[in-house]
UniProtKB/Swiss-Prot annotation:
The chain crosses the membrane at residues 1235-1255. GO terms for cellular component: plasma membrane. GO terms for biological process: cell adhesion. Its main location: membrane. It is a single-pass type I membrane protein. Residues 16-1234 are extracellular. Residues 1-15 form the signal peptide. This is Galactose/N-acetyl-D-galactosamine lectin heavy subunit 1.
Length: 1293
């Protein structure tokens, strides 16, 4: 019976950020799966009858299983191959009859599960096969064997009509759980064939061949003395990482950090023991290492050897305290090609330490936490494997929209999940596309509610796009709701969106929370009455109820994959670790010394699928059913009945004890008070050295160690030999002081004690500052303004008094120089009088960066703005002065004393300037006096009254004729009152005048434009404002910015409109065009053929003037700044420009013998390979050099002969007879030749003399002669190929 074999790899590891896809496998993604996600792909072979289901997202662990069936003479055989590309074997070495053979690296192998369709229970009538709609696609239900209940395929078939052309839609497990495949892969037989040819046939058993170069940064932040030695010893394992090009150590000492560069060979205990980490948070070290690694990775120096270029930075952080700041792993490390691996000593499993350390990592299995000395070896081994695997070459993460498969090809995930519509996978482009392609089928609809309108967004679901009135939340912690969502006219209500604690807060209490209407964040409201207490073991936890009461409950453990459907397994909490584990239900034994490490428990066909445990011979076991624990603290381990549930162990210098009353364990220190200290049998050793040594515990043993500075005791020093005997040595007279190089002198004190002092030479004229500056490690040690020293003759060292150094200072010629002091940006501005006024913007040192002052009063009465202040002094109330600053300024970084971005620093100076604008307030403004020398306050209504002869009043900042005036204007034409008297009776009438209410504003516009244009040539004048009569009375100035939008047909030369109207001159604003065509309109860019997306091309604006005086412009390529046609560095490479980055890409020219020399036979070509000549770039033949196994020469006809190097009578290639005329014999000449050139010349001479028409042979040797001469000219010492593998592979005959 033909079986459908579904081979699934159940992996649990971290995924590359590139491969993080939303989980789509309902059954296998019960948790976060170690922060990674499941993703994989199905493929089928139509001809060879195998199925492949392999996980790609777990790259670089490239691992999958093939099951293939073949039928020979009616006998069917199926073989299973487990393949891991990081560690393949030769295909011819595979024993196909051994189906249990697994030739992967064991450390990267994963459990395999086999699923089968139960064809006996599948209807033979296709019409009876049930169809099911799964994710918008019609699938068919098939019975399956345990642990499956059913499998759903997208093809209808029976056992008689089954086909290989199907996709899996879903798997239903016994118990109700299922795996749903939410997208479907395109069938692609070519992909499988290529994979089979290029991957399974790869025969190199080399772990590191696919690893990239890296630089290793190790940050020492673990100070616990009980584990330091083990760490230093085990870190030597990292020296096996062959692609590490350098190592840098980072560590704290007091308030200073230090770095040390070592080679990979020096990464061992003897080197690391010299450097001890000081206490403190390692945050600054991480930032320094990050910057150092980013610089190395970004270094693309053209003169650097390609074999030495760093592709990925690797940072190892050793820490035992929580970080002081948070890091964003993706932006700060991943995108800079830096992988961070953390090794955390967390004895008490403090969640704060775990949480802060996890913020550093995101790629691969990079987090390693341990609690004691006995876990160091396993932790560093896991670290080594994680680093090695992570150094595997990957696809370009910026170009690949999917992720990498085992051949570094870009493909897409199995789970192309989209919450809003159905998807399918396009394996050619590596992207997930909507399904069906023409009209994607919606997965979720989002109807409107009384809150507002909704739309579906991937990973978010239905989200509000537009709130109805009263529904917009006022602050973040409020959420709108309605009593009846379907009533679209109901008024929204607001409620707090704050959840109470489910677990106690860090202070140990349960809290409820309420919404803070001021900040928008949830704040603590009510605290529980009592602190959480009462836990007695690691398998208990605190929980909070709705009344903020705390209680203790046992941890509930749930079985995880692949154990869920395995009835023999149960989920148990490990009392030692507090972690849930999947264990066999009958396994109640734990080892306690003896010759075995555990009991043998099984649950399979051999035990009738029942759980059964057998003790191993010579094993010592404790049975938890009998309340037994193992006591390892004595001479030999032994089981004992105890109220405690944890084994009693030693961890370094700590011993775990049990309090039988409270049923809890506690730690106590190892007692070393009885350890004896031995001194040499002389008259000084014990007297001088006794106070400097004491007993202590180190790595679980009582040892004697120094407790003070034993290098300076009396007039000598103390040391402990390999026999642990302490001896005093008197060496004062041979010592030199650390500073000043003064001789030591032994003196006796008043208390009869001796000391070695280093008094200054009496003949020396140097001061303490001079002496100490030479041996100081401080920056700028000789600058006595900030550093003063005192020489201490007792120690021969110096004490320094350090004053705070100036901000933004550097050391030049031995002195601190302030780089930002008195720096100012010089600026000019043209004011209303048409004159240029100079002003200065000071620069300040902020966070060690010299930036323009962040706030400036542009009308300040100071030295920077004095002239502008005086100009506007008469009417400053009507002047709006604006300080323009870069939009890239980060206020948060500024307040947190962090540096600004590089982008900000590039534009900061250019973007800092002041602008001035005169405004009108209550019909008063600032205006030039008639002499145009200064400004004064002007009452516009008074001016109107004066000019018009009628009374004006201010209304809404517009001057209108007094509404009580009898003669109101008509269409803004002013009327005056005419009084006539006749017979003593006065009559009042209105008379038209030539004046209008627009006259004043028209004059303002005219004067402003005249002042702006005066004395300037080539000023573009496009008017964008005019006066408009409103309501017969008012005549304001109305601007029309539409006139300032660049008309595609109007050419203003190398100037372009900005779309803004100047509020003073009422003329359109222009920007000057120099070298940035993006500022110009698309019309003129297209006309000049500008390619904005081509970084290889730089442009310049060229202006011309026609005979009619019309100015036009065009964009020309700036040849000096462009990189359109880069030149190759030598004839054997081509040079092209990357249009995205503008950088030059150099590609080596390649050639093959069969293409360049088509008449050469494979046998002749066996001795030669093709390469490019650096003289002229032509293809030339090069003869192979000798190797350890092969020796090459030519016979008289030029035929290639390959000989066994150890037995030169044995020819390794096919022998070809050479037939030449009898009188020609140049074998002796060839044998005597010492270079390839001489050999070839001898052969050619023979052939020319004979002239027997052997054209192919002649072409071979004549070409070879040309090459030999070329090679000789280039390099007198001829170098052949490196190995016979290359020799055999490069000729393509």
């Amino acid at each position: 019976m033909k079986l459908l074999l579904l081979n699934i790899l159940l992996l649990c590891c971290l995924a590359d950020k590139l491969n993080e896809f939303s989980a789509d496998i309902d059954y296998y993604d019960l948790g976060i799966m170690s922060r990674g996600k499941n993703a994989g792909s199905w493929y089928h072979s139509y001809e060879h009858q195998y199925d492949v289901f392999y996980y790609l997202a777990m790259q670089p662990w490239r691992h999958f299983v093939w099951t293939t069936c073949t039928t020979t003479d009616g006998n069917k055989e199926c073989y299973k191959y487990t393949i891991n590309e990081d560690h393949n074997v030769k295909v011819e070495d595979i024993n196909k009859t051994d189906i249990k053979q697994d030739f992967c690296q064991k450390e990267y192998a994963y459990p395999i599960e086999k699923y089968e369709v139960d064809w006996d229970n599948v209807p033979v009538d296709e019409q009876r096969i049930e169809s099911v709609d799964i994710n918008g696609k019609t699938c068919f239900k098939y019975a399956a064997k345990r642990p499956l209940a059913y499998v759903y395929l997208n093809t209808k078939m029976t056992y008689a009509t089954k086909t290989e052309a199907y996709d899996v839609c879903r798997m239903d497990f016994i118990g109700g759980r299922s795996i749903t495949f939410r997208s479907f892969n395109t069938e692609n037989k070519a992909f499988i064939d290529q994979y089979n040819t290029n991957t399974t046939s790869k025969c190199l058993l080399k772990v590191y061949d696919n690893n990239v170069n890296t630089h290793l940064a190790i940050i020492f932040g673990i100070t616990d003395s009980t584990v330091i030695k083990s760490l230093q010893e085990n870190l030597s394992l990292l020296s096996q990482l062959k692609t590490v090009k350098g190592v840098t150590l980072y560590y704290l000492k007091d308030d200073t950090y230090f770095t040390v560069n070592i080679t990979l060979d020096q990464l061992k205990y003897d080197t690391l023991v010299k450097y001890t980490a000081g206490t403190g948070q390692v945050d600054p070290l991480i930032n320094i290492a990050k910057n150092d690694l980013a610089t190395k990775v970004a270094d693309k120096s053209k003169d650097k050897n390609a074999n030495d270029k760093i592709k990925r930075g690797t940072m190892i952080v050793l820490m035992d305290t929580a970080l002081g700041s948070e890091f964003n792993a993706e932006t700060e490390f991943d995108r800079k090609n830096i992988s961070v691996h953390t090794v955390v000593l967390n004895r008490n499993k403090d969640p704060k330490i775990t949480r802060s350390a996890l913020r550093l990592v995101s790629l691969g299995p990079h987090y390693h936490e341990f609690t004691g000395n006995d876990e160091v070896n396993a932790t560093i081994t896991a670290l080594f494997k994680g680093i090695r695997a992570n150094l595997t070459e990957r696809c370009d993460r910026d170009k690949c929209s999917g992720f990498c498969d085992a051949m570094n090809r870009c493909t897409c995930p199995m789970c192309c999940e989209n919450d809003c519509f159905y998807t399918s996978c396009d394996v050619e482009t590596g992207s997930c596309i909507p399904w069906p392609k023409a009209k994607p089928k919606a997965k979720k609809e989002c109807p409107a509610t009384c809150v507002g309108s909704y739309e579906c967004k991937d990973l978010e679901g239905c989200v509000v796009t537009k709130y109805n009135d009263t529904c917009q939340p006022k602050v973040k912690c409020m959420v709108p709701y309605c009593d009846n969502d379907k009533n679209l006219t109901e008024v929204c209500k607001q409620k707090a969106n704050c959840e109470a604690d489910q677990k106690p807060s860090s202070d140990g209490y349960c809290w409820s929370y309420t919404c803070d209407q001021t900040t928008g964040f949830c704040k603590k409201d009510k605290r529980g009455k009592e602190m959480c207490t009462g836990k007695t073991n690691n398998c208990q936890e605190y929980v909070c109820d709705s009344e903020q009461r705390c209680s203790v409950r046992d941890k509930v453990c749930v079985k995880t994959s692949p154990y869920i459907e395995m009835s023999c397994y149960v989920a148990k909490c490990n009392l030692n670790t507090g972690m849930c584990e999947n264990r066999l239900s009958c396994d109640t034994y734990s080892s306690c010394g003896g010759d075995s490490t555990g009991s043998v428990c099984k649950c399979d066909s051999t035990t009738g699928n029942k759980c059964q445990c057998n003790k191993v011979k010579n094993g010592n076991y404790c049975n938890s059913k009998n309340h037994e624990i193992c006591d390892y603290t004595g001479t030999t381990p032994q089981c004992k009945v105890s109220n405690c549930t944890e084994d009693l162990v030693r961890d370094g210098c700590l011993i775990k004890r049990c309090n039988e009353t409270s049923k809890t364990t506690y730690w106590e220190n190892v007692d070393c008070s009885n350890t004896k200290i031995e001194f040499a049998k002389d008259d000084k050793s014990e007297t001088m050295c006794k106070q400097y040594y004491s007993t202590t515990c180190l790595n679980g043993k009582c040892v004697v160690q120094a407790v003070g500075d034993v290098s300076n005791v009396g007039c000598g020093y103390c040391s402990m030999g390999t026999d642990n005997i302490i001896t005093y040595h008197d060496d004062c007279n041979s010592r030199k002081s650390q500073c000043g190089n003064f001789n030591g002198k032994c003196i006796k004190g008043n208390d009869n004690s001796y000391s070695c002092v280093f008094e200054k030479d009496k003949t020396s004229s140097k001061s303490d500052n001079d002496i100490c500056a030479e041996c100081s490690s401080l920056t700028c040690p000789a600058d006595t303004t900030y550093r003063t020293y005192t020489y201490d003759s007792k120690t021969g060292t110096c004490k320094a008094t350090v004053q705070p150094t100036p901000a933004c200072s550097v050391c030049e010629s031995g002195k601190f120089v302030e780089k930002c002091k008195d720096q100012k940006l010089e600026r000019k501005v043209t004011l209303e009088d048409g004159k240029e006024y100079k002003y200065n913007i000071p620069k300040d040192c902020v966070n060690e960066q010299c930036i323009p002052r962040t706030y400036i009063d542009c009308l300040g009465n100071d030295d920077n703005f004095k002239s502008i202040y005086n100009f506007y002094l008469p009417c400053q109330a009507y002047v709006t002065a604006t300080y323009h600053y870069s939009s890239l300024f980060n206020l948060t970084s500024y307040k947190l004393h962090l540096p600004q971005s590089e982008e900000f620093m590039k534009e900061a100076d250019k973007e800092a300037y002041c602008t001035y604008e005169i405004t009108t307030r209550e019909c008063k403004t600032c205006s030039l006096i008639e002499t145009r020398e200064k400004v004064q306050e002007v009452d516009l209504c008074a001016e109107e009254t004066k000019n018009g002869g009628v009374p004006f009043k201010c209304k809404n900042n517009n001057c209108i004729i007094d509404p009580n005036f009898d003669c109101q204007p008509i269409e803004c034409k002013i009327q005056e009152i005419v009084i006539t008297e006749k017979d003593g009776i006065k009559t009042t009438t209105c008379k038209n005048t030539t004046k209008t209410t627009c006259d004043t504003n028209n004059k303002r516009i005219e004067d402003a434009r005249k002042a702006f244009i005066e004395g300037k040539e080539g000023i573009e004048q496009v008017e964008c404002a005019s006066t408009v009569c409103q309501n017969d009375n008012s005549c304001p100035i109305i601007t029309d910015v539409e006139k300032c939008n660049q008309n595609t047909e109007v050419d203003y030369g190398c100037k372009a409109m900005t779309g803004e109207c100047d509020g003073t001159t009422y003329l359109c604003k222009f920007v000057q065009l120099t070298d940035d065509p993006s500022l110009d309109s698309e019309h003129f860019r297209t006309k000049s053929g500008v390619e904005l997306n081509n970084a290889c091309l730089k442009y310049k604006c060229v202006e011309s003037k026609g005979s009619d005086g019309k100015i036009t412009h065009k964009w020309e390529i700036d040849t000096e700044r462009s990189n359109a046609n880069p030149k190759p560095r030598n004839p054997c490479e081509t040079a092209t420009c990357n249009q995205t980055t503008g950088e030059t890409i150099y590609t080596k020219k390649t050639c093959t013998v069969s293409e360049e020399f088509p008449t050469i036979t494979p046998n002749q070509g066996r001795c030669f390979y093709c390469q490019c000549s650096y003289l002229d770039g032509s293809s030339v033949l090069t003869m192979y050099g000798e190797t350890d196994k092969e020796y090459y020469d030519l016979d008289a006809c030029g035929n290639c002969r390959v000989w066994n190097q150890t037995d030169r009578t044995q020819q390794l290639n096919n022998h070809t007879e050479c037939i030449l005329a009898g009188e020609i014999n140049n074998v002796g000449a060839i044998a005597a030749a010492t270079t390839v050139a001489v050999v070839v010349v001898a052969v050619v001479v023979a052939l020319i003399v004979v002239s027997i028409g052997l054209f192919k042979t002649y072409q071979l040797v004549s070409s070879a002669m040309k090459n030999a001469i070329t090679i000789t000219n280039e390099n007198a010492e001829y170098v052949g190929a490196d190995n016979e593998a290359t020799n055999a592979a490069t000729f393509n005959g």
